[in-house]
């Protein structure tokens, strides 16, 4: 998505970049990734990565139920005929909560401001949104990739003071952090396992 974004910028006409139908929950035709490659959880993480590239995603419905699949309900989430077995968009709710908590439309991808596998959207000097994909349990030296996968992550900031908070991409839990100072900040370890996001806003 970042590459497509750069190609579009070079045309001089900036338009939204959309990843269409990147995943249908539990859709496993012979040419698709094997389970759990299209699970609700994997697609939730994919949606975060698309959003952190400054792009939009359009998601399909469950391939297990709905139109032409017993019990044929005639649809799913989009037309209100889904059921409790369709869980993918439940995970997306937290992503919406995160992005609507700041002026996301004023930010641009700035992955050069972070390292070691993190993603960053920023309006430098004002807003920094950082996403940390799932990392291994980093307290165990038994992890084969411990030294590589558990390296610290730094964020380059414009000078100033920023309010900061963790946001669980899985549960929506918010964990406030002490004020952060630029120009370089080493992120603390996330409060829990799985993937987390960070939001920093300049203190006025």
Mark where each language-model region is.
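Extracellular/periplasmic bilobed ligand-binding domains
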Residues: 1-3
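Extended glycan-interaction surfaces of carbohydrate-active proteins
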Residues: 9
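The substrate-binding groove and active-site-proximal loops of carbohydrate-active enzymes
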Residues: 30-37
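Short strand-edge motifs at loop-to-beta-strand transitions and within beta-strands
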Residues: 183-185
